[in-house]
Amino acid sequence: MGGLCGIISEQPCAVDLFYGTDYNSHLGTKRAGLATYEKDCGFFRGIHNLENAYFRSCFEDELEKFIGNSGIGVISDTDAQPMLVNSHLGRFAIATVAKVNNAEELAHKFLAQGMYLTEFSSGIINITELISLLIVRGKDFVEGIENVYREVKGSCSILILTEDGIIAARDAWGRTPLVLGKKDGAMAVTSESTAFANLGYKTEAYIGPGEIVRLRANGYEQLRKPNPRKQVCSFLWVYYGFPTSCYEGRNVEETRFNCGKAMGEQDTVCADCACGVPDSGIGMAVGYAAGRGIPYMRTVAKYTPTWARSFMPSNQTTRNLVAKMKLIPNRDMLEGKKVLMCDDSIVRGTQLSNNAQSLRELGAAEVHMRIACPPLVYACPFVNFSASKNYLELITRRIIKEWDDEEHLAEYATTGTPQYERMVEEIRRRLNLDSLKYTTIETLVKSIGIPQEDICLHCFNGSSAFTLEEENR
């Protein structure tokens, strides 16, 4: 996915920018970059590969080089960024969190017009460069960003560091978040509000869909009003978000707790304890235990000092190894227990199957599973979710394809239909679980606590208020 952070202050910004960007590290592990601006020295940029190192270890030894009172940072799962640009709009640094489904089309369009693309990453078009080319075609930054909203099929949130402040622009449909923070003499913008607390910022406002603002050290001004409708990615609350973060005023951990509590109150399975698959399954498990009236127990613990999230590595074998090695079952708490596990989602199913087998081998009498979202039946066309680049990576779609029944996807995605029940039972069988239940869309929406029409649920039911064809008309 990726995360953004921007700081502008009356004092040097490097420390706040360093830690603020680091607090977005759970959103990506491929590359990271920082850029700062100082009136006399201009722009300074640094980019590092994160695939074999953490953000802090990459940047802490060179932090003194990032001088100036304003800067932007990015955790990226794709491009090398921020990019430095010199144009008729002036010099600026730009960072994005984007998924551009029509990148090839836009690239060919630019080339046909006599323009050129200078920066490639592993032979892949640099999306941030495409975005910058769209922006510099405007007479000002607002018109340029509106070009992005009009031309890009997918999603794009942007930070632009200029000589006159930081411009922040949220995706046109609000699919990816940006939130403003404030403290004495400084303003911040970030993807994750969890970045604010330890740095002394308080949440000032949630940037709306398509809204554009300019930050200065003493406050911010609106450059473009938000669009009237939004489609916020529901997976922000289910999986991506850090527990202390809030999106649209709704806290991640509270949402997960509410979801688990609702499932616990409705469930009838006989279990001795509830346990969450770390990290994003824990909040749901605590809620489930409260709703069901059974104890929450850490029958599985994550070895946190060195293991990152397992969906990040691009190689499936590496992902499986990371998933296995980072989670350590507690034999003494498993012996003879009927264990109910809670997890955020099931993508491929490989890791969950291995976890269930490990619990049984260490003495669990039964292993039940409850999932914090409905089955993932459709690949996401809007956000770079690293775990499902191809729909056939989804266990649901592999099963449906094996049954040669893809013309009935809507029925498989609808809770309670015969097709849905058959699919869930087949997943349960393949994962060697004693029982398996998914949250319903209704429970998920209620747990999030904002209107359903404001939430993107495409990966669950294939429907979005705005299709790729419609959204830019």
Stretch-by-stretch model annotation:
Residues 31-36, 298-304, 367-373:
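A generic structural motif
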Residues 293-339, 377-389:
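Short, glycine/charge-rich flexible loops or terminal/linker lids adjacent to PRPP-binding catalytic cores
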Residues 195, 202-203, 207-211, 261-267, ...:
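Phosphate/diphosphate-binding loops
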Residues 37-40, 163-165, 276-284, 291, ...:
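A glycine-rich phosphate-binding loop feature that marks nucleotide/adenosyl-phosphate handling sites
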Residues 1-208, 214-271, 277, 366:
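Conserved short alpha-helical segments that host acidic/polar catalytic motifs at enzyme active sites
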Residues 274, 281-288, 292, 296, ...:
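Extended, hydrophobic alpha-helical segments in both membrane/secreted and soluble proteins
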Residues 164, 200-206, 356-473:
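PRPP-dependent phosphoribosyltransferase catalytic core
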Residues 12-14, 102, 175-177, 196-197, ...:
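Flexible loop/turn segments at secondary-structure boundaries
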